[in-house]
Amino acid sequence: MDQPIQVNSEIGRLKTVLLHRPGEELEALTPDHMERMLFDDVPYLKEAQREHDAFADTLRENNIEVLYLDKLVAEALSTVELKWRFVIEMVRSSKQEDTYSTDAIINYLGSMDTLAMVRKIMSGVKKDEVKVIEPADKQLHHFLADDYPFYLDPMPNLYFTRDPAASIGNGLTINKMHWPARRREAIFMDYIVKHHPRFAQHKIPVWYNRPNRFSVEGGD
């Protein structure tokens, strides 16, 4: 069987590509918070989706297989145990400071259908979506953060799918992203490579992984 990853040239014939269709994570951007998310403008979702769909259709018309990030992740989380492990890792990697809110977010996400859960992690979890029982001894830093709308930040940069991972030969790098706003993106690729049936059985080499010390990102 052919290797699921085999990239030896930047100019060779493209057979398969991994994409992310812009989604609700773009609508979560606001002028007040877009700098934190590494944006300098708020994109128009419908136009972004129209342009993306035209691009994806062009790829298919040229006999290129198009894979989608959210669906691959959902397919990789094939057991209840994997699903919960993924949710816990995603939430804890978001640097939630309070145990009481962390547990509530984990339970909220874990109760969803797998694909819906993946998409919700991508689009972010707002504070008004989750019922959190606040502690009686609420500290000053809790009050200071009250005006921030998210428990779990959206991931509006996901459509740059070449940044968190790069195919090299029959393996790949799963990159440690430099900016905190993007560091959780690499977790998606980690679970796909380890657990998706298309990839897991091949024991794909990971040349560089996100726990490593130095940040690495894809380029234009």
Give the label of every model feature segment:
Residues 1-220:
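The feature marks the mature, well-folded catalytic cores of soluble enzymes
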